[in-house]
A protein has these predicted regions:
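C-terminal catalytic subdomain
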Residues: 144-146, 161-190, 196-205, 210-255
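DPxDG-like acidic metal-binding loop motif
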Residues: 13-27, 231, 236-237
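Active-site histidine-anchored catalytic micro-motif
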Residues: 9-19, 42, 49-53
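Internal alpha/beta core interface subdomains
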Residues: 29, 91-98, 108-141
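A conserved active-site cap/scaffold subdomain adjacent to cofactor or substrate pockets
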Residues: 119-177
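Conserved glycine-rich phosphate/nucleotide-binding loop
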Residues: 30-109, 197-216, 237-292
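Short, small-residue-biased leader/transition segments that mark boundaries at the very start
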Residues: 2-3
Length: 292
């Protein structure tokens, strides 16, 4: 096993904790911290060269840690921290290059062991974190799968890695397939499907009418137990742009927010996207997390 450190991405949960920690550690000027209310902490994420704004609740001059906000996949409720990811795509002052290939949907060449035709449709997007989305149906899934269905199947994991390698090459993140082995953090790979009833890992029933679509995502070679915060940014951004696979799974059309179903429950995420001179841009993506 080769050990390596990757500086290629970000973590949404750690971004949430960073704002609260900055206040605890005295990194935020005391004059900016209300006795009761919300403290706005601007975070510079050096890995991705982006600004993240954390809205941290304050009670009696201290970071509020308890509350009734429940983040599915995290044990026990806590205080709600709202995160704003400013200009979450890779480049540009007014929204950036969202789609590295210039396409809302690409035809990826993949091994026949992945799909018999050797071609798989994918949306390749850089927002929050470089992410590739494919249709669950195209790879033989429902979109309701839990971790055990995939993480205990070595062949399934190998198929997903083959898809991820193809996406990384097309996005320009790697030049040779073998480089993907030392770039496990990015791109993320997720599969989407229209909303349908399912049960979460804890047995909770999610009704199709409660969500806009289903999303399952892999991180570091395994299906995630819930949803990564950075991938949620990519989901919200892609959903806001008509024609992406995420948008189509959600029913198509223009939308500023979606609630999607993941293995542990649901999550709502929003994004502000617009088309300028024929190019889609996104100025902000917003979601709530807890710092537990």
């Amino acid at each position: 096993t080769t050990l390596f450190r990757s500086w290629s991405g970000n973590c949404g949960n750690l971004s949430t904790a960073a704002g609260a920690f900055a206040i605890h550690a005295g990194l935020v000027d005391a004059s900016r911290i209300p006795h009761n209310g919300t403290c706005v902490v601007r975070i510079w994420q050096a890995n991705i060269q982006k600004t993240i704004i954390a809205h941290v609740p304050i009670t009696n001059g201290q970071v509020q840690e308890t509350g009734d906000f429940e983040l599915d996949g995290v044990t026990f409720p806590a205080a709600e921290i709202v995160l704003e990811f400013l200009d979450p795509s890779d480049e540009g002052e007014d929204g950036g290059a969202l789609f590295p290939t210039g396409n809302l949907v690409d035809d990826l060449e993949v091994p026949a062991s992945v799909v018999k035709s050797g071609v798989l449709k994918a949306t390749l997007i850089s927002a929050g974190i470089p992410t590739m989305f494919v249709n669950a149906e195209d790879i033989g899934y429902e979109g309701t799968e839990l971790r055990e269905a995939i993480n205990t199947d070595p062949q399934a994991l190998a198929r997903f890695e083959a898809i991820r390698v193809a996406g990384a090459l097309r996005m320009g993140l790697i030049k040779r397939p073998e480089e993907a082995a030392t770039r496990q953090h990015t791109p993320k790979i997720a599969f989407v499907a229209p909303a349908k009833d399912y049960r979460t890992a804890s047995g909770k029933e999610i009704i199709a009418g409660e969500i806009d679509l289903l999303v399952r995502a892999l991180s570091m070679g395994k299906l995630h137990h819930a949803m990564m915060g950075t991938c949620a940014v990519a989901i919200g951004t892609a959903a806001a742009i008509p024609g992406t696979l995420v948008n189509l799974a959600a029913g198509g059309g223009e939308r500023e927010a979606v609630r999607f179903g993941h293995p542990s429950g649901t999550l709502r995420v929003g994004a502000q996207a617009e088309q300028v001179a024929g190019q889609w841009t996104v100025t902000k993506a917003v979601m709530s997390r807890s710092a537990r």
